[in-house]
UniProtKB/Swiss-Prot annotation:
Homodimer. Belongs to the class-II aminoacyl-tRNA synthetase family. It comes from the Bacteria. Catalyzes the attachment of glycine to tRNA(Gly). The keyword Aminoacyl-tRNA synthetase applies. GO terms for biological process: glycyl-tRNA aminoacylation. PANTHER family: DNA POLYMERASE SUBUNIT GAMMA-2, MITOCHONDRIAL, GLYCYL-TRNA SYNTHETASE/DNA POLYMERASE SUBUNIT GAMMA-2. It is found in: Cytoplasm. One of its GO terms (cellular component) is cytoplasm. This is Glycine--tRNA ligase. Its EC number is 6.1.1.14.
Length: 463
């Protein structure tokens, strides 16, 4: 008997079947390194971005926003250290000639055996041929930067890099933002945008791709207050995920050992989600790094520009330390889907039960907020239902569905996470009211049309 699909596999199947995510270039075979977000996926992604922006940028008096360029001057990446040290340890299987990140092979070994490989690659089996052990090329560095060329000739004079993080645009604009926004430390700059990394082994659905989106903050503080702010941003980040429905038992904090910190980091703690990948149970959702004064100082040195701050109250000048909460947008999307996914038995019209697939998404994240479902395609019901859907659509995403049995339509809405379904029936023609069904409890309530919009706004946390 075939093994039942894992929860993660079920979510991936649902995501592709219902239009959350499609393989990019699917008609040409697709690629593991990039995915397209379909009608439901783009709505979910936009809702996550909106909640993040409202929580961390627009909703705080000590934050401002920025949208910096994807292609920055090459000098930026030379100064930041990325050209020199932004690389991964690459090894190649002598059996299959597939390439792997050596650190990922070591992590998988440790997860299985409870300790790191004593002899390095000599202890590692080929993933496709477990009986073959130690058949690897020597480890060598592999640049994670994606190159492109600007101008009419593809030579070194036109060499540029696609940004591997959004942070550097914030650092290079620091002085301009400081002057024009009239902010002073402690304050932060938030940004949402695409980044690109030449991953050796993209995979695990949308978790590790070469093109992805980040939601990043660079928070500038007075030296000596950085550890306190570091702890604050860890707590705020944790609360953001749990406040939007992530179960606390499915996330954890992971502190990077000193010897594995990034070249810019004084301290880093990741928040990881229990995706239960094959060979690696946990995956990074976001990280908070104490970048100290590394970035501003290195750009001062290489650009010759003053990126310090003068504190008039203390009559002293200093280079701010930076606390960086960096969220992976598409990883967050994947975690919200996995955490919300559920299969349960629900009563059917015949007195028995059927399997119900449901996404218990927070209403603020749900790609469709309300479904309008006329009981039938009756010529009297349809105009009322369509008019209601058009009116509700002015404030929120609405799905109109008049195809099939009402129970089947409820199930279709449940599996994409629609919080509320509004049924227009023949009584609606007489009493000017509709039946509102709750996704999670399946309870139904009769609501007058006159107060429906206010009722929905309260239930959907729009007010």
């Amino acid at each position: 008997m075939a093994a039942a699909p894992s929860r993660l596999d079920s979510v991936i199947t649902l995501a592709q079947h219902r239009g959350f995510v499609f393989p990019s270039g699917d008609i040409y075979g697709g690629t593991r390194s990039a995915w397209d977000y379909g009608p439901l996926g783009v709505e979910l992604k936009e809702n996550i971005k909106r909640e993040w922006w409202n929580s961390f940028v627009r909703g705080r008096g000590d934050m401002v926003g920025l949208d910096s360029a994807i292609i920055l001057p090459t000098a930026v990446w030379e100064a930041s250290g990325h050209v020199k040290v932004f690389s991964d340890p690459l090894t190649e299987s002598l059996i299959t000639h597939k390439r792997y990140r050596a650190d990922h092979l070591f992590e998988a070994y440790e997860a299985e055996h409870g300790h790191p490989p004593a002899n390095g690659l000599d202890d590692i089996a080929d993933p496709d041929h477990p009986e073959k052990v130690g058949q690897w090329t020597p480890i060598r560095p592999f640049s994670g930067l994606m190159k492109t060329y600007l101008g009419i000739v593809d030579d070194e004079s036109g060499l540029h890099y696609m940004r591997p993080e959004t942070a550097q645009g914030i650092f290079t604009d620091f002085a301009s933002v400081l002057q024009t926004s009239r902010k002073k430390p402690p304050f932060g700059i938030g940004q949402i945008g695409k980044a690109f990394r030449n991953e050796i082994t993209p995979g695990n659905f949308i978790f590790r791709t070469r093109e992805f989106e980040q939601m990043e903050i660079e928070f500038f503080v007075e030296p000596g207050t950085d550890e306190e702010w570091f702890d604050t941003w860890i707590d705020l980040s944790w609360e953001w995920f749990t406040g939007l429905g992530i179960k606390p038992e499915n996330i954890r904090r992971f502190e990077h050992p000193k010897d594995s910190l990034a070249h810019y980091s004084k301290r880093t703690i990741d928040i990881e989600y229990k995706f239960e990948f094959a060979g690696s149970e946990w995956g990074e959702l976001m990280g908070v790094a104490n970048r100290a004064d590394f970035d501003l100082k290195t750009h001062i040195e290489h650009s010759g520009k003053d990126l310090s701050y003068f504190d008039q109250n203390k009559n002293e000048r200093y280079v701010p330390f930076v606390i960086e909460p960096s969220f992976g947008l598409t990883r967050a999307l994947m975690a919200f889907l996995v955490d919300a996914y559920d299969e349960e038995q629900a009563p059917n019209a015949k007195g028995g039960t059927d399997k119900r697939t449901v996404l218990h998404l927070d209403p603020r994240l749900a790609p469709v907020k309300v479904a309008v479902l006329p009981l039938s395609r009756n010529e009297a019901l349809s105009p009322l239902a369509r008019g209601l859907a058009d009116r509700l659509r002015q404030r929120r995403a609405v799905d109109f569905d008049d195809s099939g049995a009402i129970g089947r339509r409820y199930r279709r809405e449940d599996e994409i996470g629609t919080p509320l379904a509004v049924t227009v029936d023949f009584d609606s023609l007489e009493d000017d009211a509709v039946t509102v069904r709750d996704r999670d409890s399946m309870r139904q309530e009769r609501i007058p049309l006159e107060g429906l919009d206010r009722y929905l706004a309260e239930r959907l946390r729009e007010v």
